[in-house]
């Protein structure tokens, strides 16, 4: 029986393989109008307003004579009009854009789920902190030692190590407060 981690890896591998197969199927249709185009931007010319023309042409045919149809100027002004037009060949992969967006949204969604999980589990894991209660009651911390559950050398789990680090940090902060406020000394 596979563990949860192995199951997640298998699911991720299956999802990547599915995306790869869908991408390969889409390659046959990839050269659509949205992926490959010739874009000509023509400024205003005499009494004709400016216009942007988008057509599906090859890179070698990407010029004003092929893309601008119907030609808005009479035959003798075509060359002058086309010299003003700026034509660019543009190519992009919508499948790559889609896959990138899907991966980005998946990562953001996983992080949000993890955050919600931590928000729900955190109150269940936290124990009342006797050190924090002493700070609120303004009692002297030298008389009260923080209670450690179990053997101090046992801190094997991440949670126990984090709680130990928090206890040490809180003790340091309390000592600093005592030094500054009671003894009026700066560090």
Swiss-Prot record:
Topology relative to the membrane: Multi-pass membrane protein
Record-level GO cellular component terms: late endosome; lysosomal membrane; lysosome
Residues forming coiled coils: none
Keyword line: Membrane, Transmembrane, Transmembrane helix
Regions that span the bilayer: 10-27, 99-121
Locations listed in the record: Membrane
UniProt record similarity statement: Belongs to the TMEM9 family.
Protein name, entry field: Putative protein 2
């Amino acid at each position: 029986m596979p563990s949860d981690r192995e199951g997640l890896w298998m699911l991720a591998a299956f999802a990547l393989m599915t995306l790869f197969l869908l991408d390969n199927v889409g390659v046959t249709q990839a050269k659509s109008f949205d992926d490959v185009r010739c874009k000509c931007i023509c400024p205003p010319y005499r009494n004709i307003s400016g216009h942007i023309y988008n057509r599906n042409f090859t890179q070698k045919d990407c010029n004003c004579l092929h893309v601008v149809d119907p030609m808005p100027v009479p035959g003798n002004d075509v060359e002058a009009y086309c010299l003003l037009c700026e034509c660019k060949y543009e190519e992009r992969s919508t499948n790559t854009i889609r896959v990138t967006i899907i991966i980005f949204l998946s990562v953001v969604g996983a992080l949000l789920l993890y955050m919600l999980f931590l928000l729900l589990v955190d109150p269940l894991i936290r124990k009342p902190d006797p050190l924090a209660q002493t700070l609120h009651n303004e009692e002297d911390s030298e008389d009260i030692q923080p209670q450690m559950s179990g053997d101090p050398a046992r801190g094997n789990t991440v949670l126990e190590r984090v709680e130990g680090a928090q206890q040490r940090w809180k003790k340091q902060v309390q000592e600093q407060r005592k030094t500054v406020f009671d003894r009026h000394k700066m560090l």
